[in-house]
Amino acid sequence: MIKTGKFVYEPGEHEAEKASNSYLMSLIAVIAGLPFPIVNLIATVIFFIANKKGTYFVRWHCIQALLSQFSLFFMNSFAFWWTIYILFGEKTITNNFMAYLITVFFFNLLEFIATIYTAINTRKGMHIEWLFYGNLTNIFCKA
Protein backbone atom coordinates (compact mmCIF):
# COMPACT_ATOMS: atom_id res chain seq x y z
CA MET A 1 0.00 0.00 0.00
CA ILE A 2 2.86 2.37 0.75
CA LYS A 3 6.11 2.75 -1.17
CA THR A 4 9.14 4.46 0.32
CA GLY A 5 11.62 5.92 -2.10
CA LYS A 6 13.92 8.76 -2.97
CA PHE A 7 12.52 12.11 -3.96
CA VAL A 8 13.88 14.17 -6.86
CA TYR A 9 16.01 16.10 -4.35
CA GLU A 10 16.81 15.91 -0.63
CA PRO A 11 14.17 18.01 1.18
CA GLY A 12 15.29 20.36 3.92
CA GLU A 13 14.13 20.25 7.53
CA HIS A 14 11.54 22.98 7.01
CA GLU A 15 10.13 21.24 3.92
CA ALA A 16 9.86 17.90 5.70
CA GLU A 17 7.98 19.52 8.56
CA LYS A 18 5.49 21.26 6.26
CA ALA A 19 4.93 18.12 4.21
CA SER A 20 4.34 16.13 7.39
CA ASN A 21 1.86 18.75 8.58
CA SER A 22 -0.29 18.15 5.49
CA TYR A 23 -1.05 14.69 6.86
CA LEU A 24 -1.39 15.85 10.46
CA MET A 25 -3.97 18.42 9.36
CA SER A 26 -6.33 15.67 8.26
CA LEU A 27 -5.86 13.80 11.55
CA ILE A 28 -6.66 16.90 13.59
CA ALA A 29 -9.72 17.57 11.44
CA VAL A 30 -10.97 14.02 12.07
CA ILE A 31 -10.91 14.66 15.81
CA ALA A 32 -12.54 18.09 15.48
CA GLY A 33 -15.33 17.23 13.08
CA LEU A 34 -15.80 13.50 13.37
CA PRO A 35 -19.49 13.24 12.48
CA PHE A 36 -19.24 15.59 9.49
CA PRO A 37 -17.16 14.31 6.56
CA ILE A 38 -16.81 17.73 4.92
CA VAL A 39 -14.72 19.12 7.82
CA ASN A 40 -11.78 16.87 6.96
CA LEU A 41 -11.85 17.76 3.30
CA ILE A 42 -12.13 21.50 3.96
CA ALA A 43 -9.20 21.45 6.38
CA THR A 44 -7.01 19.63 3.88
CA VAL A 45 -8.05 21.96 1.03
CA ILE A 46 -7.22 25.02 3.15
CA PHE A 47 -3.80 23.59 4.01
CA PHE A 48 -3.19 22.80 0.33
CA ILE A 49 -4.16 26.33 -0.76
CA ALA A 50 -1.87 27.81 1.89
CA ASN A 51 1.04 25.73 0.57
CA LYS A 52 0.40 25.58 -3.17
CA LYS A 53 3.28 27.98 -3.79
CA GLY A 54 5.56 25.91 -1.55
CA THR A 55 8.39 23.68 -2.63
CA TYR A 56 7.78 20.67 -4.84
CA PHE A 57 8.14 18.25 -1.90
CA VAL A 58 5.55 20.11 0.19
CA ARG A 59 3.11 20.50 -2.72
CA TRP A 60 3.47 16.84 -3.65
CA HIS A 61 2.56 15.65 -0.16
CA CYS A 62 -0.25 18.20 0.20
CA ILE A 63 -1.79 16.86 -3.01
CA GLN A 64 -1.43 13.23 -1.93
CA ALA A 65 -3.12 14.03 1.40
CA LEU A 66 -5.87 15.92 -0.43
CA LEU A 67 -6.53 13.08 -2.88
CA SER A 68 -6.81 10.53 -0.08
CA GLN A 69 -9.24 12.77 1.81
CA PHE A 70 -11.25 13.41 -1.34
CA SER A 71 -11.99 9.73 -1.94
CA LEU A 72 -12.80 9.11 1.73
CA PHE A 73 -15.13 12.10 1.65
CA PHE A 74 -17.48 10.32 -0.75
CA MET A 75 -17.50 7.09 1.24
CA ASN A 76 -18.04 8.90 4.55
CA SER A 77 -20.71 11.20 3.13
CA PHE A 78 -22.70 8.31 1.77
CA ALA A 79 -22.48 6.52 5.15
CA PHE A 80 -23.43 9.72 7.00
CA TRP A 81 -26.52 10.44 4.90
CA TRP A 82 -27.61 6.80 4.85
CA THR A 83 -27.43 6.82 8.66
CA ILE A 84 -29.41 10.07 8.84
CA TYR A 85 -32.01 8.57 6.51
CA ILE A 86 -32.34 5.51 8.76
CA LEU A 87 -32.53 7.57 11.96
CA PHE A 88 -35.09 10.08 10.72
CA GLY A 89 -36.74 8.24 7.84
CA GLU A 90 -38.77 5.11 7.58
CA LYS A 91 -35.88 2.82 6.68
CA THR A 92 -34.51 0.11 8.95
CA ILE A 93 -31.00 -1.12 9.54
CA THR A 94 -30.19 -3.79 6.96
CA ASN A 95 -27.31 -6.16 6.38
CA ASN A 96 -26.22 -3.99 3.45
CA PHE A 97 -26.08 -0.93 5.69
CA MET A 98 -24.04 -2.74 8.34
CA ALA A 99 -21.68 -4.17 5.71
CA TYR A 100 -21.17 -0.70 4.26
CA LEU A 101 -20.49 0.81 7.69
CA ILE A 102 -17.93 -1.90 8.44
CA THR A 103 -16.27 -1.30 5.08
CA VAL A 104 -16.17 2.46 5.63
CA PHE A 105 -14.78 1.94 9.13
CA PHE A 106 -12.08 -0.36 7.73
CA PHE A 107 -11.06 2.14 5.03
CA ASN A 108 -11.00 5.01 7.54
CA LEU A 109 -8.88 2.98 9.95
CA LEU A 110 -6.50 1.98 7.17
CA GLU A 111 -6.21 5.60 6.02
CA PHE A 112 -5.70 6.77 9.62
CA ILE A 113 -2.82 4.32 10.16
CA ALA A 114 -1.28 5.14 6.77
CA THR A 115 -1.55 8.85 7.50
CA ILE A 116 0.25 8.52 10.83
CA TYR A 117 2.97 6.38 9.24
CA THR A 118 3.38 8.83 6.36
CA ALA A 119 3.43 11.89 8.61
CA ILE A 120 6.16 10.39 10.79
CA ASN A 121 8.35 9.30 7.89
CA THR A 122 7.78 12.42 5.81
CA ARG A 123 8.89 14.44 8.82
CA LYS A 124 12.16 12.47 8.65
CA GLY A 125 12.55 13.62 5.04
CA MET A 126 11.53 10.31 3.48
CA HIS A 127 9.34 10.27 0.40
CA ILE A 128 6.25 8.09 0.91
CA GLU A 129 3.98 7.24 -2.03
CA TRP A 130 0.63 5.59 -1.41
CA LEU A 131 -0.67 2.98 -3.79
CA PHE A 132 -2.97 4.65 -6.35
CA TYR A 133 -2.71 8.12 -4.75
CA GLY A 134 1.02 8.36 -5.42
CA ASN A 135 0.54 7.82 -9.15
CA LEU A 136 -2.31 10.34 -9.25
CA THR A 137 -0.20 12.84 -7.34
CA ASN A 138 2.62 12.43 -9.86
CA ILE A 139 0.14 13.34 -12.61
CA PHE A 140 -1.27 16.40 -10.80
CA CYS A 141 1.92 17.79 -9.27
CA LYS A 142 4.51 19.17 -11.67
CA ALA A 143 8.01 20.21 -10.63
Residue ranges and their predicted role:
Residues 1-33, 39-66, 119-143:
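Membrane-interface extramembranous regions at the lipid-water interface
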Residues 18-41, 64-115:
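Hydrophobic alpha-helical transmembrane segments in multi-pass membrane proteins
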